[in-house]
Amino acid sequence: MKKIVFEKRDLSTEDSEAIANALMKGEIPEIQVSALLTSLAMKGESFEEIVGFARAMRNNAIKISYPEALDTAGTGGDGLGTINVSTITAIILSQLFPVAKHGNRSVSGKSGSADVLEALGYNINIAPELANKLIKENNFVFLFAQIYHPAMKNVANVRKTLGIRTIFNLLGPLTNPAGTRYQLIGLFSSKVMDIVAKAASLLDYKKVFIYHGEPGIDEISPYGYTTVYEITNGKIQQYRLHYSDFGLKRQIPIEKITATSANESAIKILRGVMGIDSDIRDFIGINVAVGLKLIGKAEDARDGFEYAMQLMESTIQHLRRIIESNGDIKKFDQLVRQVGKG
């Protein structure tokens, strides 16, 4: 720890993993944890440190084994309050590919993936033995971070007291308890893209897309350009996508795709997939399109967007089956009726 706190030097992957293991076992006093996390944030986390911490979090997680699945967990934290597009993207893609959606409560907007799924009627408190059953039944399961990463309770108080972004804000997407080897990762800042991409290239993934969109969202942007890092079997390729690459002929202002609560996010998501709100529909569509390319179901952005539009036609029925298996179907049906009337 002296290397970081006093000398501001990067830790090796091995040292980072050892320190993170000690943190999660509660072996380091809170005052030292606070100094460590603050020093890492001030110095800037290296990709070796992210790899080490991610491996420790994975080792300390309650695991389910479904490595050939996809996750769409982003970091959140962009502060712009967009609807939870990564969650509906996961649900739409699960019509074609198994998805183990790892998530938590809100970081950036008014609702995280856990919040919006609850608003739709889904039960987020899923034990590991049930998780395996659900993903086999419907190709989709939600893995609530608070259940599957119990060791994180040992740093929760310090993180809350500090009130700043720490290395743990980058780790959620890299620590899926199912060991998913396919991943869509939206980042809150373009400044961390290089280090997260390098870290992901060292973490046993088959294919990962990492992106950050204008004007500063952790999603594919309907407003301007999105920078994408595509990682395939450890090799990194970088490029940019513009909303026009998907076939969109208009810019969608960010205020058209935001929500102030989990319930509003859920309603707007349903309005999008039901074709009632074209701005939300297209925002969802471009994010699904990138996921379709990742899983090999689309050649390019435009092809993916067209396929995403087709998939949305069956999404309500698919989502209904998911909630019927694990949730409050009456709540969901009522919400769908409300949206349809409105």
UniProtKB/Swiss-Prot annotation:
Its cofactor is Mg(2+). The keyword Glycosyltransferase applies. One of its GO terms (molecular function) is anthranilate phosphoribosyltransferase activity. Binds 2 magnesium ions per monomer. It comes from the Archaea. One of its GO terms (cellular component) is cytosol. Mg(2+) 1 binds at S86, E219. It catalyses: N-(5-phospho-beta-D-ribosyl)anthranilate + diphosphate = 5-phospho-alpha-D-ribose 1-diphosphate + anthranilate. 5-phospho-alpha-D-ribose 1-diphosphate binds at residues 74, 77-78, 82, 84-87, 101-109, 113. Anthranilate 2 binds at R159. One of its GO terms (biological process) is L-tryptophan biosynthetic process. Mg(2+) 2 binds at D218, E219. Gene3D superfamilies: Nucleoside phosphorylase/phosphoribosyltransferase catalytic domain, Transferase, Pyrimidine Nucleoside Phosphorylase, Chain C. The gene is trpD. Pathway: Amino-acid biosynthesis; L-tryptophan biosynthesis; L-tryptophan from chorismate: step 2/5. Catalyzes the transfer of the phosphoribosyl group of 5-phosphorylribose-1-pyrophosphate (PRPP) to anthranilate to yield N-(5'-phosphoribosyl)-anthranilate (PRA). Belongs to the anthranilate phosphoribosyltransferase family. Anthranilate 1 binds at G74, N104. It is an enzyme of class 2 (transferase). Homodimer. Keywords: Amino-acid biosynthesis, Aromatic amino acid biosynthesis, Glycosyltransferase, Magnesium, Metal-binding, Transferase, Tryptophan biosynthesis. This is Anthranilate phosphoribosyltransferase.
